[in-house]
Amino acid sequence: KYDFSSTSEKKKYQEEYDKMYAECKRTLYSAGYHIYTSIDPDVQKQLQSSVDNALSGYTEKDKNGIYKTQASGTCIDNDTGKVVAIVGGREQKNIGYTLNRAFQSPRQPGSAIKPLLVYAPALEHGWSAGSTVNDSPMSTKDKHRVRNSHGSYSGQISLRRAVQKSSNVATMRIYEQLTPKTCLKYLEEMNFKYLTDSDYKYYTTCIGGFTKGTTSEEMAAGYATLKNDGVYREPTCISKITTS
């Protein structure tokens, strides 16, 4: 379930979900199931190597011997909607179970969220690639002064150009016009599970300033939804489970 009428309903659902998840996990370890996955070993190896190589210069570890600087990644086959590779952190030997950051550790998505949260909804609400938007400094309704990170402004620009230059102010203007409630509804329907009430309140959400953030699994599934003509498919690497 992805759609909730209130925060309390969502919290209650999550509690029941966690309880059932724990029960299923116990059964998984004791019932002798055969589990078939969509993981592609070659893609998995490449993704793990990409994460490890990108962070190889960061060697500091915590008291448990785990690297402090981490990353995650998720790769989805757009034809099937299945996860073919998922990396929850840097590869280490003899560590045992660690947090799978790909779906358990939200981080700020930054500008990567703009197409999912603002531009795709804009297209569904009558905008086109040629529609114009003001790319000039502005103040939002919640009193935030918004500027472009690169410090340049172009006045009236097309939606296409706004995406190309990743304009903060153009994105914010569209977000204000559509309203946070309208835009965030799209993330709700794609099961972005770390949304909070504050994310609906502050306009900086649309440029990646979430309270908790998103996961690489959520982001990959979101972009896979764009490729699938707007139809969301829940990301999973499980193909089937048998008892014999």
Stretches with model-predicted labels:
Residues K1-S38, E188, K193, T204-G208:
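Non-catalytic, structured segments within soluble enzyme domains
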Residues S30-S38, T59-D62, N100-Q108, R145-S152, ...:
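Second-shell loop/turn segments in exported
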Residues K193-S244:
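Active-site-proximal helix/loop microenvironment
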